[in-house]
Regions:
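Ribonuclease/tRNase effector modules and their secretory precursors
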Residues: 2-27, 34-37, 41-171
Length: 171
């Protein structure tokens, strides 16, 4: 309600402080849990901490499951080369920030289908390594466009690299 009742109601001073809280609903992007008694009692922050732990556990499970992908070869109809997954690409994918972080991580386990359906957009020089070619594939994660990055190295290796939800990658 108006007083944000999910926050603890100790006295008029604390409730007015909750109104100014940068971690209140609608403004949250919690990286570090505030270290004070009022925030420790906050139902919202406790729930966010619990969700963060759940995501961390699931990320480790996905990393373990995805290790089986290293033995497989993947293809895209618009791209004429075989795509491989490495341990490095699994880690990079899972560490990549994304607006739909959990959905993006789960997508890794369905990478065969995702790459099959993804639209091949073309290639360019990788901005992190001038000797590497970056190929881009467009996909959708939770109704929002995202771009899968596949790197082609000078030795001919073609590996899944990562995924991004930033359209800056198209520039």
């Amino acid at each position: 309600g108006r007083q944000m009742a999910c926050f603890p109601f100790y006295n008029p001073y604390t409730i007015s402080r909750c109104k100014d809280c940068p971690d209140r609903p609608g403004t949250m992007g919690l990286v570090k849990v505030p270290d004070n008694e009022l925030c420790a009692a906050c139902k919202m922050i406790r729930e966010m901490t619990r969700r963060k732990e759940t995501l961390k556990i699931r990320r480790k499970e996905i990393q373990k499951e995805a290790s089986g992908l290293k033995k497989e070869v993947f293809r895209n109809p618009g791209f004429g080369k075989e795509i491989h997954v490495t341990g490095k690409s699994i880690k990079e994918w899972l560490n990549q920030p994304h607006r739909r972080y959990a959905e993006k991580n789960e997508l890794l386990l369905q990478i065969r289908e995702v790459l099959q359906k993804a639209g091949y957009l073309g290639y360019g020089i990788d901005k992190h390594d001038a000797g590497t070619v970056a190929h881009l594939f467009e996909t959708v994660v939770g109704k929002e466009k995202s771009w899968i990055i596949v790197r082609e190295y000078a030795n001919g290796e073609v590996n899944l690299h990562s995924i991004s939800d930033s359209d800056n990658i198209l520039k």
